[in-house]
Amino acid sequence: VLVNNAGIVGTVSPCADLDEGEYLRICAINQTSVFLGMKHVIPSMKRAGGGSIINISSISGLVAIYGTPNVAYAASKFALRGLTKQAAIEYGADGIRVNSVHPGYIRTKMMTESLTDEQIVIASDSVPIKRVGEPVDVSRLVIYLASDESGFTTGSEHVIDGGLTSV
């Protein structure tokens, strides 16, 4: 099992104002590191007869978030969708399943360092179930995807956002 859980927000900036070096740095951490993890584990998984790769993306990898000018974060998380789906079809016959997880607002260090308490309350109110997620919410989904119980699941996008992207 490989869980790629790399991610930084980086500089929040509209496209025209973002420094190219910062864009590349964010993509290197959020996207290229995931590619490298997969590249280096797939041969071992093939020799073992299969495995599960779980790429942690974001709802920002599914939909643009209005009011949050963060082109590099969005681009890097959208890229994980294509990487996941392509690897799923390339290695399915080898018994390797590849899926992505797209969390919404989850109470992590990234959230608490980038949002004020007031902003977290606003985020909670914007979620249909009226709370932000906890890390355990995501870990339960990851455990399922890592297990044999998800043996017929590959190339899938799993949204865990309390219904936020449904509105």
Model regions and ranges:
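Short C-terminal tail/terminal secondary-structure segment
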Residues: 9-12, 142-143, 154-167
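Substrate-binding pocket helix/loop in short-chain dehydrogenase/reductase
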Residues: 13-15, 19-24, 111, 123
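Active-site helix of classical SDR
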Residues: 38, 76, 84
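Alpha-helical segment proximal to the catalytic Tyr-Lys
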Residues: 43, 89-90, 151
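Residue(s) in the substrate-gating loop at a strand-loop-helix junction
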Residues: 58
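Short, small/polar-rich loop/turn modules that mediate ligand/substrate recognition or access, typified
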Residues: 92, 97, 153-155
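A conserved structural motif in NAD(P)-dependent oxidoreductases
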Residues: 127-138, 149
